[in-house]
Amino acid sequence: MAVTCDPEAFLSICFVTLVFLQLPLASIWKADFDVTGPHAPILAMAGGHVELQCQLFPNISAEDMELRWYRCQPSLAVHMHERGMDMDGEQKWQYRGRTTFMSDHVARGKAMVRSHRVTTFDNRTYCCRFKDGVKFGEATVQVQVAGLGREPRIQVTDQQDGVRAECTSAGCFPKSWVERRDFRGQARPAVTNLSASATTRLWAVASSLTLWDRAVEGLSCSISSPLLPERRKVAESHLPATFSRSSQFTAWKAALPLILVAMGLVIAGGICIFWKRQREKNKASLEEERE
């Protein structure tokens, strides 16, 4: 039995196939939603926690979607969540045991991962992906880590002609600002060295100055972060009494040559006057004897 083909049906099939081939492949995978992240970087304190939050638009439920947070460069999984369950298989060891999925608002299209015990290595850009079948949307979340470190300490040591004050601190991130002032509020120039740990990337600070001004009663050391300009840690130190005594001794040492020169001039002048008067007396005596 011969199979016949309706020419009109064949043309219809060809037309539909042609239209389908004309469609961009990207439109097949394009999601019916957008994913948005924070508009500004998120500030996280070293040792604290940070929340990586992303939002669906429109506000549809994400309960049945695959949700993934990962480091954009390179692509390392921070946390994965799918259909109400955490998927730990692809999570990198750096994040195991310190991420928590917050499911409070997933039904309204808002999802968040909380990362605990923040370190300097969390200072980077992250990506969040919401995937529904073969369709997905992505957004980025930038995290900036800040740390003021330990309280600064000032160590004062006597020098031959002054005093040396060194301010030290550790655990700062990123590079900190160091400011040295005296108790009158006057800035004091100092030599500051900053060094970063190869293992923690935290910065250590050592700022030293030598003070020659005997009128200064004490010094302060202020450390602040460029990410937290309104917050700072300050240490103050009164100069020891030995510095004032050594300062007085140094002042006497500086004045002693002048005093000796002045005394020498006075003595020399006195001797000159004495010999001049003695000569005049001797001359007068000789003239009287001649008369």
Curated annotation (Swiss-Prot):
Residues 1-26 form the signal peptide. Belongs to the immunoglobulin superfamily. BTN/MOG family. Disulfide bonds join 54-128. GO terms for cellular component: external side of plasma membrane. Residues 276-291 are cytoplasmic. Residues 27-254 are extracellular. It is a single-pass type I membrane protein. This is Putative butyrophilin-like protein 10 pseudogene. The lineage of its organism: Eukaryota, Metazoa, Chordata, Craniata, Vertebrata. It comes from Homo sapiens (Human).
